[in-house]
Each structure stands twice: as C-alpha cells, then as structure tokens.
Amino acid sequence: TNSITHSFTLGHDFIVNQLITTSIGLGYSDADAKVDAGNDYETYDGSLNINFAFPWAYISVGNALSFNDYKKADSSVNSSIIRSDVTHTFDIMVTKAIGDFFPAIDPNRSLFINASYEKMKSEANIMNYDYIADSFSLSFSKSFNLNN
C-alpha cells in the first residue's frame, strides 16, 4: 500500500421504538504516505443516521461531515498553502428482501436488494479540490448463519 493509516471511531446506536433507530458516530484518522508527496493528513468525522424499519422496507438516511487537515503544503498547486477541506455527505439507502417479491426464489427472506444514493460536496482552501459528486448503487446481499 502507499500509506499507513490509524483510525479511531466511537459510535452510539439508540432504539427510539420498534420503527425508528438512530446512529451517531465520531471518528479520527491519521494517514501517512510512504512516499511523501504532501498526502499526509488527519481526518475528523461526525455522522448522524436515522433508520426506519418499516414492514415493507428498511430505510436509512444519513448525514456526515469530514474535516481533512493535510500536514504539508501541496507543491503541485501552491507551495505555500497547506490544504484543508471539509466534506459533507448525505446518503439514503433502501433495503428489501427479494422473497417479498419472489417467495419461490427466496422463501426464507435472506436475499436482499439494496439501493442507495449519496451526494458529496467538498470544499477546500485550494480551489482545485472543490467538487460535488453524486453516486448511485444497486447491490444484492445474502445473509446466512455459520452455526448451522
């Protein structure tokens, strides 16, 4: 790998009722590039998710903020400025058992379809690193028990 990273994360999940849960997270990471071209940085993260366990689907809506502080000036743009940026991420995910649509294929309802959308907006003190990105994802997952 090109870098060594150490991170710490603290999270708390809270059950409001049978339908609603929340997740709060705080994190810190320190990345050090092996070949040091100014890509050493520290990241501070905070996130909040609210989750809904509806009978017809599981929906999660989240918001996160990440603050990146680089340790060396970026010589590719301006050698006197140390890069610092903040990234705001909004995401929504919907999960549904395939067995709810096709009981013959998944009678135990252990095969899931997941659809998600993520919007990231990053602002830096160096304009070259400002961006807005949208991401869509569709995936399938299978749950199974290792004790059987």
Describe the role of every protein-language-model region:
Residues T1-N148:
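Gram-negative and organellar
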